[in-house]
């Protein structure tokens, strides 16, 4: 993951931070709190990481696994048969964690659906990076004026994820097709 900045501010113009590789999502993972970070019937996993001295450190409750309702998956109401109404609820398994890197908290959510679909959602939260606003330095289109005295730089969070699909054996392939009119 890389975070390039598009600001003219001397505090930010030089930045192109590699949050995921320079700091590491794994090493910056938070312990999750019951009832706040995950809801429902929850199973937590601890994570283990190497410390700078080579010892092993444990992050308790680093990964949350739970199941949640995801609406109607299938429904049929047959008007030719009185009272025939079938509904199947959709469920998804959620595997999630949070990592704090600098002023950002990244929530990483993997969703596993009953139809085999796998979805990744990354939620960004935290504290806005700011600098003192000055009309000669901060330009529209490069910085946001968030108050009369403060500016925040325009930047992006670009993620790239690789999944190793060696399920059952190494001969499996995955194809994605995008159809446009």
Task: Give residue ranges: language-model regions.
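Beta-strand/loop-rich accessory regions of lumenal/periplasmic or secreted enzymes
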Residues: 1-181
């Amino acid at each position: 993951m890389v975070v390039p900045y598009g600001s003219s501010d001397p505090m930010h113009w030089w930045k192109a931070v590699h949050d995921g590789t320079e700091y590491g999502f794994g090493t910056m993972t938070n312990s999750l709190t019951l009832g706040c970070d995950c809801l429902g019937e929850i199973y937590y996993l601890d994570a283990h990481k190497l410390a700078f001295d080579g010892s092993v450190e444990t992050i308790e409750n680093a990964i949350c696994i739970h199941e949640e309702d995801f609406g109607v998956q299938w429904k049929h109401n047959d008007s030719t048969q009185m009272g025939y109404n079938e509904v199947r609820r959709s469920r998804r398994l959620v595997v999630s964690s949070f990592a704090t890197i600098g002023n950002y908290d990244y929530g990483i959510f993997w969703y596993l659906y009953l139809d085999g679909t796998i979805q990744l959602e990354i939620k960004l939260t935290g504290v806005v990076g700011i600098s003192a606003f000055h009309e000669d330095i901060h330009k529209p289109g490069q910085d946001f004026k968030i108050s009369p005295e403060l500016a925040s730089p325009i930047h992006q969070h670009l993620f790239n994820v690789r999944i190793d699909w060696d399920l059952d054996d190494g001969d499996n392939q995955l194809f994605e097709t995008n159809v446009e009119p």
